[in-house]
């Protein structure tokens, strides 16, 4: 039995390919492929291209979300990969993200969300 409700990766990616960070169609495909890789269920994807550069996007999942915000001028991307349930693995999404953005360094904050005391959960 799960001792927590969800797994949440907060990702800091530096030294990314600036062209990939500014490629809105590529980012949308990366989000969709990330959802498939981690075993989640896609509800919808929304992206937005900024002028003169940069993008933001979110994949809304039945199990939570994957979100990205890019800064091509710094070679930087900030991402959240938050999944709930035993059947999902956010680290599988990270493999897809790494392949597309090609970061030179990655900082990962790995959170367990909805921690349950002794494996039980009670709403008050």
From Swiss-Prot:
EC number(s) from the headed UniProt entry: 4.1.1.50
Bound cofactor: record note: Binds 1 pyruvoyl group covalently per subunit.
Residues under site feature: Cleavage (non-hydrolytic): 63-64
Enzyme class, broadest EC rank: lyase
Influence of temperature on activity: Optimum temperature is superior to 90 degrees Celsius. Thermostable. Retains full activity after 3 hours at 70 degrees Celsius.
InterPro entries, sorted: AdoMetDC_C, AdoMetDC_fam_prok, AdoMetDC_N, S-AdoMet_deCO2ase_core, S-AdoMet_deCOase_pro-enz
Pathway(s) served: Amine and polyamine biosynthesis; S-adenosylmethioninamine biosynthesis; S-adenosylmethioninamine from S-adenosyl-L-methionine: step 1/1
Entry superkingdom: Archaea
Keyword Lyase: yes
Reported regulation of activity: Competitively inhibited by methylglyoxal bis-guanylhydrazone. Inactivated by treatment with the imine reductant NaCNBH(3) only in the presence of substrate.
PTM statement from Swiss-Prot or TrEMBL: Is synthesized initially as an inactive proenzyme. Formation of the active enzyme involves a self-maturation process in which the active site pyruvoyl group is generated from an internal serine residue via an autocatalytic post-translational modification. Two non-identical subunits are generated from the proenzyme in this reaction, and the pyruvate is formed at the N-terminus of the alpha chain, which is derived from the carboxyl end of the proenzyme.
GO MF annotation list: adenosylmethionine decarboxylase activity
GO biological process assignments: spermidine biosynthetic process
Post-translational modification Pyruvic acid (Ser), affected residues: 64
Catalytic activity: S-adenosyl-L-methionine + H(+) = S-adenosyl 3-(methylsulfanyl)propylamine + CO2
Activity across pH: Optimum pH is 6-8.
Keyword terms, alphabetized: Autocatalytic cleavage, Decarboxylase, Lyase, Polyamine biosynthesis, Pyruvate, S-adenosyl-L-methionine, Schiff base, Spermidine biosynthesis, Zymogen
GO CC term, one of those recorded: cytosol
Cofactor(s) listed: pyruvate
Residues the record marks as active site: 64, 69, 84
Gene3D superfamilies attached to this UniProt entry: 3.30.160.750, S-adenosylmethionine decarboxylase domain
HAMAP family assigned to the protein according to its UniProt record, in alphabetical order: AdoMetDC_1
SUBUNIT field: Heterotetramer of two alpha and two beta chains arranged as a dimer of alpha/beta heterodimers.
Physiological role: Catalyzes the decarboxylation of S-adenosylmethionine to S-adenosylmethioninamine (dcAdoMet), the propylamine donor required for the synthesis of the polyamines spermine and spermidine from the diamine putrescine.
Similarity section: Belongs to the prokaryotic AdoMetDC family. Type 1 subfamily.
Protein name: S-adenosylmethionine decarboxylase proenzyme
Organism the protein comes from: Methanocaldococcus jannaschii (strain ATCC 43067 / DSM 2661 / JAL-1 / JCM 10045 / NBRC 100440) (Methanococcus jannaschii)
Organism phylogeny: Archaea, Methanobacteriati, Methanobacteriota, Methanomada group, Methanococci
């Amino acid at each position: 039995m799960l001792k927590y409700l969800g797994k949440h990766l907060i990702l800091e990616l530096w030294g990314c390919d600036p062209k990939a960070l500014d490629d809105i169609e590529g980012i949308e495909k990366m989000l969709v492929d990330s959802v498939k890789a981690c075993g989640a269920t896609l509800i919808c994807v929304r992206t937005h291209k900024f002028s003169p550069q940069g993008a933001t996007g979110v994949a809304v999942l039945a199990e939570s979300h994957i979100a990205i915000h890019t800064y091509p001028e710094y070679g930087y991307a900030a991402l959240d990969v938050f999944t709930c349930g035993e059947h999902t693995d956010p680290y599988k999404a990270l493999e897809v993200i790494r392949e597309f953005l090609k970061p030179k360094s990655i900082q990962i904050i790995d959170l367990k969300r909805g921690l349950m005391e002794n494996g039980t959960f009670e709403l008050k």
